[in-house]
Amino acid sequence: MDFSSTRVLCIGDVMLDRFMHGSVERISPEAPVPVLRITSTHSMLGGAGNVAHNIADLGGTAILVGLIGHDDTAIALRTHLERVPGIVNALVESPHRPTICKTRFLAAQQQVVRTDDESHLPTQPAEEMLLQTMVATHITECGAVILSDYGKGVLSPAVIKHVIGLARQAGIPVFVDPKRLDFSVYAGATCITPNVKELSAAAHQRADDEASVIAAARIVMQQAEGASILATRSEKGMMLIEAPAEGRDDIAIHTVPARAREVFDVSGAGDTVIATLALAHASGLTLESAMRISNAAAGVVVSKAGTATLNVDELRAELDESAISNGSTGSARSLGEARSLVKKWKQLGLTVGFTNGCFDILHAGHVSLLNEARTRCDRLIVAVNTDASVSRLKGPTRPINGFEDRCTVLAGLRSVDCVVGFQEDTPLSVISVLLPDRLFKGADYREEDVVGGDVVRAAGGKVELIDLVPGRSTTGIVKKISTLT
């Protein structure tokens, strides 16, 4: 999973989130209100800025377009942007409005009050022109566009129409985090990501179970002229109602559950969803696969306090723990099951690695090779010789451990995601079916001699050799045991 070459243009309401932490120990003598004694403060990018921050922390590049004022908040916001190398500052400064700033006052991690410093004036024609020019300058560099609409004025109907028009001309998908009740303003977008409350309000009907979510989505899809709808459903996960495509007359429906966890803060979870969705789709994944990745990403950030982001390592770890990772089950899978896993993993943009062997008596050399292989890929498949295959290769006294035992031990390793058996002397047939992205063997081989290497390379993959741990072998262990008896 590598987003380093993916660029996303993010336009919307950029703001600064400030947090004032303290304690409440008394009531004011001036009025019946608590007195908050401030002990610490911090600030971070908010709104569309948080969307861009999520993209950057996942390894992508965000082109951030929005309006800021000529004030101290703008200076603080620019300072934050300078600290995030993955964000390109394409903000427009306006003398007609303040930089949006939301300040939260907290005691014992509970909000006491929030203040909003913002303008309620509609976007001026001159501001719209500057925003449109900035978008036109950068849009062709990007693989996706995000409209982060917080309803604060930047995304006026004129700006939305202009941006979507430019994107469609360039064949660039557009993702919308909506705030408006009328989704017709987003006509031409690729995917809109309302939560169920926003979806219900836009469709003017309930959206509290799968059937009603689908019905509501059909209504707003007509308003938005065929945009797909990704409905976020809190603890129920997500539902993607995908617009009809070539070869399909009706919508396609995909669901993914949320993994049970302790939720600390849902602030900014929607920003993470749309950032990951757009980034994953721009990198080549289908909308369904991008939804599954964004669902995992949202699961990470809601377990953190405050407006949070995540990095690729955290996302990989969450995929490992979630149902979509489909890790090993403690025994060998059939070739058909392994092929299905590989297909799903590749749809998620994961790099699939492969190695093989007898693994008769698991030793430090085996574990070292498997651990190193797993660091070079996102998922590792280990193909294991059956007992008959081992006997043909090693002699009638082998294997020491039976096939099921060997597979169970391997499947119990954290570095191994799938174990599959093969009856032949080589794993060529397995490799030809699975077509892994990486084929790993010990450095005692030459690349040109690795079985299946030509098949993997022809499919665009690589053969990689891994250094062995000296003096470690099953044969050596067997000989040592024989001297003791």
Curated annotation (Swiss-Prot):
Q: Does the keyword Nucleotidyltransferase apply?
A: yes
The reaction(s) catalysed by this protein are: D-glycero-beta-D-manno-heptose 7-phosphate + ATP = D-glycero-beta-D-manno-heptose 1,7-bisphosphate + ADP + H(+); D-glycero-beta-D-manno-heptose 1-phosphate + ATP + H(+) = ADP-D-glycero-beta-D-manno-heptose + diphosphate
Q: Which UniProt keywords apply?
A: ATP-binding, Carbohydrate metabolism, Kinase, Multifunctional enzyme, Nucleotide-binding, Nucleotidyltransferase, Transferase
Entry GO CC: cytosol
Pathway linked to the protein: Nucleotide-sugar biosynthesis; ADP-L-glycero-beta-D-manno-heptose biosynthesis; ADP-L-glycero-beta-D-manno-heptose from D-glycero-beta-D-manno-heptose 7-phosphate: step 1/4; Nucleotide-sugar biosynthesis; ADP-L-glycero-beta-D-manno-heptose biosynthesis; ADP-L-glycero-beta-D-manno-heptose from D-glycero-beta-D-manno-heptose 7-phosphate: step 3/4
Please indicate which superkingdom the organism of origin belongs to.
Bacteria
Region Cytidylyltransferase, as annotated, extends over 354-485
Q: Where is this region: Ribokinase?
A: 1-326
GO terms for biological process?
A: ADP-L-glycero-beta-D-manno-heptose biosynthetic process
According to its UniProt record, what is one Pfam family this protein matches? CTP_transf_like
What molecular functions are annotated in GO for this chain?
Answer: ATP binding; heptose 7-phosphate kinase activity; heptose-1-phosphate adenylyltransferase activity; phosphotransferase activity, alcohol group as acceptor
Output the InterPro entries linked to this UniProt entry: Bifunc_HldE, Carboh/pur_kinase_PfkB_CS, Cyt_trans-like, PfkB_dom, RfaE_dom_I, RfaE_dom_II, Ribokinase-like, Rossmann-like_a/b/a_fold
Keyword Cell inner membrane on this protein?
A: no
Residues passing through the membrane, by range: none
Q: Indicate the quaternary assembly.
A: Homodimer.
Similarity remark: In the N-terminal section; belongs to the carbohydrate kinase PfkB family. In the C-terminal section; belongs to the cytidylyltransferase family.
Q: What is its biological role?
A: Catalyzes the ADP transfer from ATP to D-glycero-beta-D-manno-heptose 1-phosphate, yielding ADP-D-glycero-beta-D-manno-heptose.
Q: What is this protein called?
A: Bifunctional protein HldE
> What is the native source organism of this protein?
Granulibacter bethesdensis (strain ATCC BAA-1260 / CGDNIH1)
Gene (name only): hldE
